[in-house]
A protein has these predicted regions:
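Basic/aromatic-rich interaction segments and small domains that mediate binding to polyanionic partners
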Residues: 2-77
Length: 77
C-alpha cells in the first residue's frame, strides 16, 4: 500500500474515533513546544493526514500526532 493511501485510511479512522467535541488528556507530546502532560482539551477536528487539532484547556491549540504523541480519551461525543 502506498503512503498516501495509508495516511488516508488512518485519518478516516481517527476522524471516526475522535469527532469534534471529544475530550482528551495528554500523556506525552513529542514537540519542542509541547503542551504539559496531564493537560486536557477538546477535539476541534482531524485533518486529512490524521493530526488531531485541539483546543487545550490551558489556551493552547497545538495538534496531536497520534503516531508520536500519547493521550487518552476522556469522553465520547
Amino acid at each position: 500500500m502506498n503512503e498516501f493511501l495509508r495516511l488516508e485510511r488512518e485519518a478516516k479512522r481517527y476522524k471516526e474515533q475522535y469527532p469534534k467535541g471529544t475530550r482528551l488528556e495528554l500523556i506525552s507530546m513529542e514537540d519542542p513546544q509541547a503542551v504539559p502532560p496531564g493537560t486536557r482539551g477538546t477535539v476541534q477536528f482531524v485533518d486529512d493526514v490524521g493530526s488531531i487539532h485541539m483546543n487545550w484547556d490551558n489556551g493552547r491549540t497545538l495538534a496531536l500526532v497520534p503516531k508520536e504523541d500519547s493521550f487518552r480519551k476522556l469522553t465520547d461525543v
